[in-house]
Amino acid sequence: MATTLIELTKTRTQTEGPYWLPGSPERKDVTEPGMPGEPLLFRGKVVNIRGKPIADAWIDVWQADSQGSYDIFGYRLRGHQMTDAEGRFEHLTVVPCEYDAPLTNADGETRMVYRTAHLHVKVKAPQRSTLTTQVYFPGNPGNERDRGYGDDCLLEITQTPEGKIGEFTFVLG
């Protein structure tokens, strides 16, 4: 993405959800040996609103596994890394599954809320606010049922013999 005089739209902030854990390990591969699921290379860039790459941005990812479960005590399918000089990052993971999550309202009533397949992401860069967002998979029939879903946060998916590649450019203000 070349630097431009036109301002790009900042990536939309979304809920962190209840499953973020601080202190994730710095690593590219967030899977474990023998983990079930379709391989996914999640890669992309972090840029400013002019399209200029942001080097040394901290990008933290966490997600459900291929059965729709989160590791809430450890760091399976969790990790962070720093972007390179061109603002690029890559994480090796698996395609997550949709799931139903409990949501408790102010009156203490709990109901189940559908979540389509997604990846959670936090991006932190010098002199900028932390971006917390989620990215989604195009064509998932459950996307429209998810309250957080939006076309503005869709991964660009390429299918390869080894699995999927999901790409996204995060734009920070």
Q: Model-derived features: where do they sit?
A:
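Beta-strand-dominated extracellular/periplasmic modules and repeats
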Residues: 2-173
